[in-house]
Amino acid sequence: MADRYPGYDVLDKWDSPSFDDVTRDVLTDRLDRIPARRFLDEREWALLEAVVARLLPQPDRADPIPVTPWIDRMLAEDRGEGFRHEGDPPMRALWREGLAALSDEAPGFATFAAEEQDALLGRVQRGEVQSDRWRAVNPKRFFAQLLRAAAGIYYAHPAAWNEIGFGGPANPRGYVRLGFDERDRWEAQEAHDG
């Protein structure tokens, strides 16, 4: 991936007015306090790792952003979005059933070539599944839940912020320049071709 924000590192703002103590504590958690496995079993964890690696590939990253540990923590603490679709099982059961159905749909998913994994995930996303295990959970909704959780966790990490030029929460510094094509001096400068 091309570096759209060359030289930008949001963590350079650590001791600046851009970050307050609460922000620094949250970022310390995301960077240094990666949760241990508490909810998923080893097979579920390995499958989720393989799925996340296809949804959010990180081939050029020396230290990939950890996503599975944070999903596992969310499940262990039973912290969801505060709603569920009619007919869906509770969140933890949804994840267990969804991962079991995915495993049944494609035994050995983690060993498949990337193209095969992507094709299978596309079928799940479209609801074009074969396994009877999907009767317990809607494949389209499970895929949407999986993608939302994975992307939300990924883009909560400072390394992902660097990729998109995000400077972190606006408090306490706030935004001043709000006009078209204006940016505050603390915002990342995007590289332009030519």
Placement of each model-derived feature along the sequence:
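Functionally engaged cysteine thiol sites
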Residues: 20-21, 178
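Mature-region segments of soluble proteins
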Residues: 1-13, 26-33, 43-50, 54-194
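Intrinsic disorder at enzyme termini
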Residues: 15-18
